[in-house]
Amino acid sequence: MESMFEDDISILTQEALGPSEVWLDGPGDPSLGGDMCSASHFALITAYGDIKERLGGLERENATLRRRLKVYEIKYPLITDFGEEHGFPLYEIKDGSLLEVEKVSLQQRLNQFQHELQKNKEQEEQLGEMIQAYEKLCVEKSDLETELGEMRALVETHLRQICGLEKQLQQQQGLRDAAFSSLSPPAVPATACPDLDLHYLALRGGPALGHAGWPGPTSVSVSELERRRLEEALEAAQGEARGAQLREEQLQAECERLQGELKQLQETRAQDLASNQSECGMAWVKRVGDDQVNLALAYTELTEELGRLRELSSLQGRILRTLLQEQARNAGQRHSPLSQRHSPAPACPSPSPPARPPPCAPCQSPAAQRRSPVPPCPSPQQRRSPASPSCPSPVPQRRSPVPPSCQSPSPQRRSPVPPSCPAPQPRPPPPPGERTLAERAYAKPPSHHAKAGFQGRRSYSELAEGAAYAAASPAWLQAEAATLPKPRAYGGELYGPGRPLSPRRAFEGIRLRFEKQPSEEEEWAMPASPPSPEASTIRCASFCAGFPIPESPAATAYAHAEHAQSWPSINLLMETVGSDIRSCPLCQLGFPVGYPDDALIKHIDSHLENSKI
């Protein structure tokens, strides 16, 4: 487009017009003035130049836009509605190649600039090093200048001393000259006796004449002496300077030696500190190892104590179950006539739910009995309803929800419908010298043994052995003082989430003191039956059956057992050591003397936790 408007300005000039053509508003036209023609011509030329410049700028912008559009079309080809790609002519490909060439050239220039930048960085580093070296040289130069100034000051002092000595020498020489001049006599005229005068002059004026006429030997000797004296002073000053240099060298050597000793001392000190730190680290490791060994020994001892406690608990549970089964058989034999009267048809259906499994055999292990949903020992509900499931009961107001496996051993709480069992065979009481294994296991320990166990051991199950209580009397076995303790699971496995609900589980949250109530005695009492001589022992066994029995060590690991460590609970427990009946000092709940101390302390801990003490 620039070529189109390149020479169009010639149409406004006179040369572009033909010889026969004349401007309408030219200067030769008499109808228009000269000033007006020139002004209009200049305005037209200016406007045409502006228009041409604008058109050139627009053309350049259009070319740039076309070039960019071509680049975009090459990068992102357009697809028509018919699915065909838009074809580009050959000049567009040429423009792309030109762009590639420009890109390569720009990349080369960029690499060149980067190379120059790297060179500039290296030069800057070299310049920095040179500046540092120059600074070091400047520092050394300043040091040398200071040393030179000191030497100059020293030389000036020596020169001043030499000048002073020379002045003193000149003064002394002047004084000597004055003394010699005062000693010489004035001139005397000639006399008749010239020989005497000559002789006198020879005798008295010899030195003066010699001093005045020519330099005598005295002046020469004085100058020699002064020179020698000055040389000696100069040599002495040089010797002092050499001595000062030697002392300086000696002091420098001493300083270097002291610096070496200081470095050696620092190294030895660092080595000593490192060795001390290593020794301290080894001592700390040894101390930690000893602590771990002591902790492992204490853990082992505590595990053994807990194992012995669980073995004792399982032994007591087996003894209690065997005792309860014996008492149940005896009670069933005593109540058999009444059950035969009230249940003539023994094959009638039982009112209890048929989905209950049969009771477990008495010879099962403690673990199996704990897992069984129907425990062989009677619960408090079974004591309230001792009717056997195999016989129909005409009084259905007190039915047991779970069919018990044995009759309740309490004679004061007998059901009006006893089971079909043979006649009771009363057993005579045992002699006082013979003691059952249950009485030995639940005998009350002496108070001093219990206190010694609390003070000397971390595990409070030391006195749970049955042999330690063999000499104690079962004074706590009283029917009026029987209570039901709060059952607690050992390790969370006694009543797991997968175990079925048992009568003992139903009575977990109920604290019940089984005392004689008038309504119950009127309802359940049977005046025809004589009181059993073994009432206290049976009541003790049924009462102890409500306590949780810890599992054996083989059943669960020690990690599930919680050890009581609360000292307030221990102090509260120590208050009940000397009493006849072990009871909780907070809720007055009675416990057997042989009940584990750890479980009792945990019971007190539950009160303290609930009250947030």
Curated annotation (Swiss-Prot):
Q: Which GO terms describe its molecular function?
A: zinc ion binding
Show the GO cellular component annotation of the record: cytoplasm
Q: Name one GO biological process term.
A: innate immune response
In residue numbers, the region (Interaction with TBK1 and IKBKE) covers 281-330
| Subunit (UniProt) | Homodimer. May form a heterodimer with NAP1. Interacts with TKB1 and IKBKE. Weakly interacts with DDX3X.
| InterPro entries to which the protein is assigned, alphabetical | CALCOCO1/2_Zn_UBZ1 (IPR041641), TBD (IPR024581), TBK1-IKBKE_adapters (IPR051891)
Indicate, by first and last residue, each region the UniProt record lists as having compositional bias (Low complexity): 362-372
Q: Where is this region: Homodimerization?
A: 1-280
The role this protein plays is: Adapter protein which constitutively binds TBK1 and IKBKE playing a role in antiviral innate immunity. Essential for the efficient induction of IRF-dependent transcription following infection with Sendai virus.
Name used for this protein in its record: TANK-binding kinase 1-binding protein 1
The residues that the entry says bind Zn(2+) are 584, 587, 603, 607
Could you confirm whether the keyword Hydrolase appears in this record?
no
Q: Which UniProt keywords apply?
A: Coiled coil, Immunity, Innate immunity, Metal-binding, Phosphoprotein, Zinc, Zinc-finger
* Record region (Disordered): 328-457
Biased composition of type Pro residues is found at 346-361, 389-406, 416-433
Q: Where are the coiled-coil regions?
A: 48-162, 218-277
Q: Where are the zinc fingers (UBZ1-type)?
A: 581-607
In-chain residues carrying the UniProt-annotated modification Phosphoserine: 184, 365, 372, 379, 385, 400, 415, 502, 532
